[in-house]
Amino acid sequence: MRRTFAHARRTVRSLASSAGESGGSSRRAGGVVLFGGMVATTLYLGTWQTRRYFWKTQLIEEREASLRRAPAALPSTSGPGTAAAVAEANAFRLLTVRGMLDHDREVKVGPRSPPKHTAAHDDPLCEKNGFCIVTPLRRTGGAQQGERVLVHRGWVPKSALDAGKLDRPTGEVELSVVVLASEEQGRFTPDNEVASGHFFWLDTAALAQRAGIADGGVLVQTVGDGASNWKQQVWPLAKPVAALTDFYVTREKHAGYAATWYSLAFAGALMSVRLLR
């Protein structure tokens, strides 16, 4: 009887030990799967951010090369599809355009903060609430006589706009510009109200409709040094050339994101190795 009881007790202990080893192995395997999945995911994200870094670098180099080209006169934009073709062929190239600004059809877009690389943006005392000013221009001289284009003249603080300090030159002007693409409407950005002239984001087609420009028109943006107008308190403030190569997510951010993901992948790999020992 005693032998039978002792044998049963040894059997129970053996089964318990086996169950413990089995449970430990299961937990170890689960940990390896968990950390292995983390390693694979973070490696993928790190590689993706690395590719984005080199892609962003290439875009910046292409823009800088285009901006170094000699300025040229804005080509004719009349005719179906011509405006889109001109915009595509002259992306980020400095252009000149001559004509008369139609201030009666001026539109403000915003609210907006001042453009980067300007004293207004960097000065903490400068008002940050303002608007972009878009004004139609009727071209003068040459084959482009009478054509109309949309000119994004720059940014103005709300207080200066309310006080009537916006500069509205009369007569013929010659502007240094770059072609500007339409913006994508943000998820929480209201719809533009073309009829009332309330614009919250840059939509070339809607702005052209408001200005009565056929064939969609082309939108150009004036460029400057970003400092002189601010010092002289002359509005609107044109975007400087240096800001044309800016992106919301910079190359440095992509590099930082990649380093973070690769660090997490390395930590996950170490944890997986420890679990396998």
PLM features per residue range, with description:
Residues R2-R277:
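Surface-exposed, charge/polar-rich loops and edge strands
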